[in-house]
Curated annotation (Swiss-Prot):
SUPFAM superfamilies: Initiation factor IF2/eIF5b, domain 3, P-loop containing nucleoside triphosphate hydrolases, Translation proteins. GTP binds at residues 365-372, 412-416, 466-469. It comes from Ehrlichia ruminantium (strain Gardel). GO terms for molecular function: GTP binding; GTPase activity; translation initiation factor activity. InterPro entries: EF-G-like_DII, IF2_II, IF2_N, P-loop_NTPase, Small_GTP-bd, T_Tr_GTP-bd_dom, TF_IF2_bacterial-like, TIF_IF2. Residues 365-372 are annotated as: G1. This is Translation initiation factor IF-2. Residues 466-469 are annotated as: G4. Residues 390-394 are annotated as: G2. Residues 502-504 are annotated as: G5.
Length: 856
């Protein structure tokens, strides 16, 4: 094995370096006194160096004695190597001690100038404060230097590798120590030369140290720092610290990236990745709920994308923005077209088998012509007795069975003018219209309207001339009147069946039923049964015991208990129960069958369509899509003319809270109220809803100064007491006529009287007695009409009105009078202080007349 020298530098108080020569083949013994200190391990090699710092340097003698410990340690090897120091090296040591003494004196002279350098040394001290601790697998060798720094080395099994590791560590120790000494003793050229010569003499090892020194200086980029030997302990700087610093930098970068990921991507270990369905438009709140993320986090990411600060939960996002946000949270997404969803729902069953179904017959006609009575006679029921004053206020749907297996579905519509929308919706779901005309009244306005609805819907029609049992009934007169409106009876060569009937006497009811079945057979009515159910909402209301109740007619498919339905753009829910018109429970409903369903979350508008969907989530998506379409349509409406806003605000308002039993009644009343128009007053329906009067309705009426209109609903005792305390008026009605009439009366009372100026006389000025600040005293003659005290006077000069005022005082001679008629003279006090010309000035007398206005 080649031998090379390894140098262990022991720092003396003078700053000199003492060298001890060891052979690489020598084996180091282990010191039994091992003190544990602060340490950190570095797996640079299997050899580890533990450096312990001393508190304070001893004197030069103690340093010399400490340096001899290395020489006196037992070394396994040849006995001839025990005295390892040569004579030349001993002389060098003595010279080093002498130089150290000289350097100490020079250091004392320059200590004041080096105070600022000592401050830099503190930072260097902090960097090398931590000792390096390397543990060898076997025994330990304690090497003590004069700086009281202890290096504990453990030999390894392979002595060759162990020798090389010890050599590298000791050489590295010398390199760092020499660097620090050079910084402190720049002027000591002899010592610097000795160290340089020694490093160059080491050959390959010296080159390595130069390379380390160069890399160390390039990385640090700092000037060499001078350390005062009298004040601070010199520490061994290892190149290992550079790698530790790089590791620290890598850890800082890793921490920064981890924090950045938490802020931007919110990536969390074991986070659930969700698949988010993104429609064309979605709100911030809905998107956050779909991802199960906090809304605040979604808003933060959205701010990074758009740069907007004022992001609300209800703001809509398009599909592109939503997809970017979903990816930012490491979720996946799928674009969903809700328009396609709705089309797919309604396209189900188009190519399936068609099965015959029952006809849907709508009974229409003018009010009080006997529509409900006719249905009662056909159904053998007594619905009309349950209606207030015998007037139908709602749409009713019934199904009867004829001849054992033939079924007919009847829809009864109100005949009042206000229910025009109901009749229009009734024709949209019907197959056949039975137009009821009273034989004694003939064709009436709602009869004509019903005929127009039939023509618009292009459905078959049968005319039932009711009350044929009356003595003044004239069938020919009815058929001729129908001819004027384009309805040609079979007796006149047309295709419209006219059946004279009597609901009261039950005349020709079988003929009417047969006519309905005949037309139904001709129409060949069929529908698909084996598909998702869809149809129309006939009526809806809120029941205090059952909640929302909706009357539906199934037009396609089969509706079952447990199905989830969507009705219009605001109501959906699971069908909990179904009942027929007679109150019987039903499990399924086939096409043309009317049923009452329970379970919707909201009251749907009558006339809207319903359809069965797969899940509540799909139901919500469909509702949102329809509401978006509605918002788009509303946004297309023309904006309010700003020039009319001021005039609109000046119009008086009657605030109304409307509560009805069913949605159809609400629409009918709103339709009728909307027809009441006046330029100076209007009705503002502040709130409308289905159900009984509640405390919240009373409180709303109090804050908005409204009246409450209750149609076919009740008010409990507590609500009545609250309304009495708040002085809120609640008006109850059971007939729509009464509501409209009362609203007109209330509006009439709110209208201000119309004031008009009516000329009642003319005065000519005869003499001007005085003109002053208090007015003018004039002598006048009544040329026409009369003049009254306090009347309005318009002073006219050359056909121009130069003054308008009132007569403050009216006298005849010395007496105050109330009026003076034509042909008499009078004196007046006029509130006018300018010059008056008796010859040319004329005064016209006017009286303010108030005209009471009435809303028709």
């Amino acid at each position: 094995m080649n031998e090379s020298k390894s140098v262990a530098s022991n720092e003396l108080t003078s700053g000199k370096v003492e060298r001890t020569t060891l052979k690489l083949s020598d084996k180091l013994k282990i010191s039994s006194n091992i003190q544990q200190g602060n340490k950190f391990s570095l797996n640079k090699s299997i050899t580890t160096v533990e450096v312990r710092k001393s508190k304070k340097r001893k004197n030069i003698d103690e340093a010399a004695r400490s340096s001899l410990l290395l020489q006196n340690n037992d070394i396994d090897g040849n006995s001839e190597d025990k005295n390892s120091l040569t004579i030349q090296e001993q002389i060098s040591r003595m010279n080093a001690l002498q130089n150290a003494s000289n350097n100490e004196k020079r250091e004392e002279l320059s200590s004041d100038s080096n105070k600022h350098i000592e401050e830099e040394v503190i930072s260097v001290k902090a960097e090398v404060e931590q000792p390096v601790d390397v543990v060898l697998p076997n025994d330990n060798l304690l090497i003590e230097s004069d700086s009281s720094e202890k290096v504990i080395v453990d030999p390894v099994t392979d002595s060759e590798h162990a020798d090389k590791d010890v050599q590298d560590v000791v050489m590295l120790d010398e390199f760092v120590s020499s660097n620090l000494d050079d910084a402190g003793d720049q002027k000591n050229g002899d010592q610097s030369d000795d160290i340089s010569d020694l490093l160059e003499h080491k050959g390959i090892e010296g080159k390595k140290l130069k390379k380390y020194e160069k890399e160390h200086e390039e990385k640090k980029g700092n000037p060499k720092k001078v350390m005062s030997n009298n004040t601070y302990t010199k520490h061994v700087k290892l190149v290992i610290e550079e790698e530790l610093e790089e590791d620290n930098n890598k850890q800082v970068i890793k921490n920064y990236r981890s924090k950045k990921n938490r802020v931007t991507n919110r990536s969390v270990k074991n986070k659930i990745t969700r698949k988010v369905l993104i429609p064309n438009k979605i709100t911030v709140q809905e998107l956050a709920n779909s991802m199960s993320e906090r809304v605040k986090d979604v808003q933060q990411v959205l701010y990074q994308i758009t740069g907007k600060h004022d992001i609300k939960l209800t703001d809509y996002l398009d599909s592109d923005q939503a997809s970017i946000i979903v990816e930012a949270f490491n979720h996946t997404f799928k674009l969903v077209d809700n328009a396609k969803l709705e089309n797919d729902l309604y396209s189900d069953g188009n190519n399936m088998e068609l099965i015959p179904r029952a006809p849907v017959v709508t009974v229409m006609g003018h009010v009080d012509h006997g529509k409900t009575s006719l249905l009662d006679a056909i159904r053998e029921s007594n619905v009309v007795d349950g209606e207030f004053k015998g007037i139908t206020q709602h749409i009713g749907a019934y199904q009867i069975t004829l001849n054992g297996d033939k079924k007919i579905t009847f829809i009864d519509t109100p005949g009042h003018e206000a229910f025009a929308a109901m009749r229009a919706h009734g024709t949209n779901v019907t197959d056949i219209v039975v137009l009821v005309v009273a034989a004694d009244d003939g064709i009436m306005p709602q009869t004509i309207e019903s005929i127009n609805h039939v023509k618009a819907a292009n459905v078959a029609m049968i005319v039932a001339v009711n009350k044929i049992d009356k003595h003044d009934a004239d069938l020919d007169r009815i058929t001729n009147a129908l001819l004027q409106h384009g309805v040609v009876a079979e007796s006149l060569g047309g295709d419209v069946i006219v059946v004279p009937v009597s609901a009261k006497e039950k005349i020709n009811l079988d003929q009417l039923k047969s006519s309905i079945l005949l037309i139904a057979d001709l129409l060949e009515l069929k529908a698909v049964y084996n598909t998702r159910a869809s149809g129309t909402v006939i009526e809806s209301k809120v029941d205090k015991n059952c909640g929302v109740v909706a009357t539906l007619i199934v037009q396609k498919g089969t509706l079952k208990v447990g199905d989830i339905i969507v009705a219009g753009n605001q109501a959906y829910g699971r069908v909990r129960n179904m009942f027929n018109a007679d109150g019987g429970s039903e499990k399924v409903a086939i096409p043309s069958m009317p049923v009452k369903v329970f379970g919707l979350n909201n009251v749907p508008n009558f006339g809207t369509s319903f359809i069965v969907v797969d899940s509540e989530k799909q139901a919500r998506e469909l509702i949102n899509y329809r509401q978006d379409l509605l918002n788009v349509e509303l946004s297309k409406q023309p904006a309010i003319d700003k020039s009319n806003v001021l005039l609109y605000d000046m119009v008086d308002e009657l605030n109304v809270i409307l509560k009805c039993d069913v949605m159809g009644s609400i629409e009918a009343i709103c339709y009728s109220i909307g027809k009441i128009t006046h330029k100076d007053i209007r009705v503002n329906i502040l709130y409308k809803g289905v159900g009984n009067i509640t405390k919240s309705d009373v409180l709303l009426a109090e804050t908005s100064n409204s009246i409450i209109l209750a149609f076919n609903v009740k008010t409990d005792t507590q609500v009545k007491e609250l309304a009495k305390q708040k002085n809120i008026e609640i008006k109850h009605y059971f007939v729509i006529y009464d509501i409209i009439d009362d609203i007109k009366k209330i509006l009439t009372g709110m209208l201000k009287p119309l004031k008009q100026e009516v000329q009642i006389g003319t005065l000519s000025v005869r003499k001007v007695f005085s003109v002053g600040n208090n007015g003018s005293v004039l002598g006048c003659y009544v040329t026409s009409g009369l003049v009254k005290k306090g009347a309005l006077v318009k002073l006219v000069r050359n056909n121009n009105i130069i003054h308008e005022g009132k007569i403050k005082v009216l006298r005849r001679f010395k007496d105050d009078v109330k009026e003076v008629t034509a042909g008499f003279e009078c004196g007046i006090l006029l509130d006018y202080s300018k010059e008056i010309y008796p010859e040319s000035d004329v005064m016209n007398i006017f009286e303010i007349v108030e005209e009471i206005r009435v809303i028709q």
